[in-house]
């Protein structure tokens, strides 16, 4: 019996919505990354984007365990000499709550063109409102 290999044109990408309120950041991000990659589908193929679209709402209400709220530091560089910037989880969740989930999920996806295409299927919103009602997303309990 031959091994099934998914073709990019035959893959069906579904839309799912996840409520991040009260969920742990790492556990939530790991499941989202797995679904963006398509590992939950029987037709998963490593070199084809078989994953689904994921909408995350209430990103501002995600939680972390232990002292990570004050100790976890996010770094980015401005591309100017000496331009490394840092911000703690507490400050980032106030300033841009979407970035906490995006950063966690991006680190769990493959690096390269396929991983970047998978990451584009992630839509994160700080509040409960999202503009994707036309896609009729299904509720996903994680």
UniProtKB/Swiss-Prot annotation:
Protein name: Large ribosomal subunit protein uL13
CDD domains found in the cross-reference section: Ribosomal_L13
PANTHER family, per the entry: LARGE RIBOSOMAL SUBUNIT PROTEIN UL13M (PTHR11545:SF2), RIBOSOMAL PROTEIN L13 (PTHR11545)
Superkingdom per UniProt: Bacteria
Alphabetical list of InterPro entries matching this protein: Ribosomal_uL13, Ribosomal_uL13_bac-type, Ribosomal_uL13_sf
Family assignment from sequence similarity: Belongs to the universal ribosomal protein uL13 family.
Pfam families cross-referenced by the UniProt entry: Ribosomal_L13 (PF00572)
UniProt entry keywords in alphabetical sequence: Ribonucleoprotein, Ribosomal protein
Subunit and partners: Part of the 50S ribosomal subunit.
GO CC terms, sorted: cytosolic large ribosomal subunit
Reported function: This protein is one of the early assembly proteins of the 50S ribosomal subunit, although it is not seen to bind rRNA by itself. It is important during the early stages of 50S assembly.
Keyword flag Transport: no
One of the record's GO molecular function terms: mRNA binding
Record-level GO BP terms: negative regulation of translation; translation
């Amino acid at each position: 019996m031959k091994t099934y290999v998914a073709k990019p044109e035959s893959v069906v990408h579904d839309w799912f919505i996840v409520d991040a309120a009260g969920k742990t950041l790492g556990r939530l991000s790991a499941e989202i990354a797995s679904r963006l990659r398509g590992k939950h589908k029987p037709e998963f193929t490593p070199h084809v984007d078989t994953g689904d679209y994921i909408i995350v709402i209430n990103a501002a209400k995600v939680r972390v365990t232990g002292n990570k709220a004050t100790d976890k530091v996010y770094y980015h560089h401005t591309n100017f000499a000496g331009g490394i910037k840092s911000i703690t989880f507490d400050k980032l969740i106030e300033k841009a709550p979407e970035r906490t989930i995006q950063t966690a999920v991006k680190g769990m996806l493959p690096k390269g063109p396929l991983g970047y295409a998978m990451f584009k299927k992630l839509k994160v919103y700080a509040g409960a409102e999202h503009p994707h009602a036309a896609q009729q997303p299904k509720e996903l309990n994680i």
